[in-house]
Amino acid sequence: MCGYYGNYYGGLGCGSYSYGGLGCGYGSCYGSGFRRLGCGYGCGYGYGSRSLCGSGYGYGSRSLCGSGYGCGSGYGSGFGYYY
């Protein structure tokens, strides 16, 4: 589920608008893409379809975010969902 903010299963992200995906992380989601996780500090810095961010701000293809910033533990998606 999406940490502190919003809906964890599609629709709403963390304080902002996401398109059928998970918007996780610290702060608002800035344009969470189509069926992807917007992870990291500020949430939504890794644009692209059906991909998840890597560590921090980075990009990643079909990989979950690590701990600290982004999905994993603490901020964002605690269980590391991928759809």
From Swiss-Prot:
One of its GO terms (cellular component) is intermediate filament. Keywords: Keratin, Repeat. RPT repeats lie at residues 9-15, 19-25, 44-55, 56-67. The keyword Nucleotide-binding does not apply. GO terms for biological process: keratinization. Transmembrane segments: none annotated. Signal peptide: none annotated. The keyword NAD does not apply. Disulfide bonds: none annotated. In the wool cortex, wool keratin intermediate filaments are embedded in an interfilamentous matrix, consisting of hair keratin-associated proteins (KRTAP), which are essential for the formation of a rigid and resistant wool shaft through their extensive disulfide bond cross-linking with abundant cysteine residues of wool keratins. The matrix proteins include the high-sulfur and high-glycine-tyrosine keratins. Belongs to the KRTAP type 6 family. Interacts with wool keratins. This is Keratin-associated protein 6-1.
